[in-house]
Protein backbone atom coordinates (compact mmCIF):
# COMPACT_ATOMS: atom_id res chain seq x y z
CA UNK A 1 0.00 0.00 0.00
CA UNK A 2 1.22 3.51 -0.85
CA UNK A 3 0.16 6.83 0.65
CA UNK A 4 -3.06 8.14 -0.92
CA UNK A 5 -2.54 10.47 -3.89
CA UNK A 6 1.26 10.22 -3.79
CA UNK A 7 1.63 12.51 -6.81
CA UNK A 8 0.02 15.27 -4.76
CA UNK A 9 2.24 14.78 -1.69
CA UNK A 10 3.09 18.16 -0.14
CA UNK A 11 6.44 19.02 1.40
CA UNK A 12 6.26 22.56 2.69
CA UNK A 13 9.23 24.90 2.44
CA UNK A 14 8.86 25.77 6.12
CA UNK A 15 9.05 22.08 7.08
CA UNK A 16 12.40 21.75 5.31
CA UNK A 17 13.98 25.11 6.17
CA UNK A 18 12.39 25.66 9.57
CA UNK A 19 12.77 22.11 10.86
CA UNK A 20 14.61 19.40 8.88
CA UNK A 21 17.52 21.62 7.81
CA UNK A 22 17.47 24.01 10.78
CA UNK A 23 20.38 23.34 13.13
CA UNK A 24 18.91 25.83 15.61
CA UNK A 25 15.55 24.04 15.98
CA UNK A 26 15.28 22.30 19.38
CA UNK A 27 13.62 19.20 17.91
CA UNK A 28 15.09 19.26 14.41
CA UNK A 29 18.74 20.06 15.04
CA UNK A 30 19.97 16.45 15.09
CA UNK A 31 18.05 15.74 11.87
CA UNK A 32 19.52 18.88 10.30
CA UNK A 33 23.07 17.83 11.17
CA UNK A 34 22.42 14.38 9.73
CA UNK A 35 20.88 15.62 6.47
CA UNK A 36 23.69 18.17 6.10
CA UNK A 37 26.29 15.37 6.44
CA UNK A 38 24.47 13.62 3.59
CA UNK A 39 24.91 16.67 1.34
CA UNK A 40 21.55 18.41 1.71
CA UNK A 41 21.82 22.21 2.01
CA UNK A 42 19.40 24.97 2.96
CA UNK A 43 20.24 26.82 -0.26
CA UNK A 44 18.98 23.80 -2.22
CA UNK A 45 16.13 22.79 0.08
CA UNK A 46 14.06 21.50 -2.85
CA UNK A 47 16.51 18.60 -3.29
CA UNK A 48 15.50 17.20 0.09
CA UNK A 49 11.82 17.95 -0.55
CA UNK A 50 11.95 16.10 -3.88
CA UNK A 51 13.86 13.17 -2.38
CA UNK A 52 11.23 12.78 0.35
CA UNK A 53 8.36 13.01 -2.17
CA UNK A 54 10.01 10.37 -4.34
CA UNK A 55 10.47 8.11 -1.33
CA UNK A 56 6.75 8.40 -0.54
CA UNK A 57 5.80 7.57 -4.15
CA UNK A 58 8.03 4.50 -4.39
CA UNK A 59 7.95 3.00 -0.91
CA UNK A 60 5.29 1.11 0.97
CA UNK A 61 3.35 2.35 3.98
CA UNK A 62 4.41 0.43 7.09
CA UNK A 63 1.91 1.86 9.59
CA UNK A 64 -1.42 3.71 9.44
CA UNK A 65 -2.72 5.61 12.47
CA UNK A 66 -6.03 7.39 12.84
CA UNK A 67 -6.31 10.43 15.10
CA UNK A 68 -8.61 13.36 15.66
CA UNK A 69 -6.38 15.35 13.27
CA UNK A 70 -6.53 12.87 10.40
CA UNK A 71 -4.81 9.75 9.12
CA UNK A 72 -1.04 9.40 9.49
CA UNK A 73 0.99 7.18 7.20
CA UNK A 74 4.48 5.97 8.08
CA UNK A 75 6.68 5.18 5.07
CA UNK A 76 10.11 3.56 5.19
CA UNK A 77 12.47 3.49 2.25
CA UNK A 78 15.54 4.94 0.60
CA UNK A 79 16.20 8.46 -0.61
CA UNK A 80 19.04 9.49 -2.88
CA UNK A 81 21.43 12.04 -1.42
CA UNK A 82 23.44 14.75 -3.19
CA UNK A 83 26.58 12.80 -2.26
CA UNK A 84 25.32 9.86 -4.33
CA UNK A 85 24.48 7.58 -1.43
CA UNK A 86 21.17 5.94 -0.68
CA UNK A 87 19.84 6.65 2.77
CA UNK A 88 17.10 4.68 4.54
CA UNK A 89 14.62 7.07 6.13
CA UNK A 90 11.25 6.99 7.82
CA UNK A 91 8.77 9.65 6.75
CA UNK A 92 5.41 10.44 8.31
CA UNK A 93 2.61 11.92 6.21
CA UNK A 94 -0.86 13.09 7.23
CA UNK A 95 -4.13 13.42 5.38
CA UNK A 96 -5.92 15.87 7.62
CA UNK A 97 -9.62 15.80 8.25
CA UNK A 98 -11.37 18.57 6.32
CA UNK A 99 -8.13 19.68 4.64
CA UNK A 100 -8.49 22.22 1.87
CA UNK A 101 -5.50 21.07 -0.21
CA UNK A 102 -5.29 17.66 -1.88
CA UNK A 103 -2.68 15.08 -1.04
CA UNK A 104 -0.86 14.06 2.11
CA UNK A 105 1.42 16.55 3.90
CA UNK A 106 4.86 15.69 5.29
CA UNK A 107 4.98 15.72 9.10
CA UNK A 108 8.56 14.57 9.70
CA UNK A 109 11.48 12.58 8.34
CA UNK A 110 14.44 10.97 10.03
CA UNK A 111 17.06 8.32 9.33
CA UNK A 112 16.27 4.71 10.10
CA UNK A 113 18.69 3.02 12.42
CA UNK A 114 19.56 -0.64 12.04
CA UNK A 115 17.32 -1.42 15.04
CA UNK A 116 14.33 0.24 13.30
CA UNK A 117 14.38 -2.17 10.37
What are these regions (language model features)?
Residues 1-77:
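Compact soluble domain cores
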Residues 113-117:
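Low-complexity, intrinsically disordered terminal/linker segments enriched in charged
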Residues 51-105, 112:
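Functional cores of ribonucleases/endoribonucleases
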Amino acid sequence: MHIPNPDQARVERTKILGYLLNQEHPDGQSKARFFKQCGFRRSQWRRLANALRNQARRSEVTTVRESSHGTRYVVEGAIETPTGNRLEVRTVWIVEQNQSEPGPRLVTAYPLSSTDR
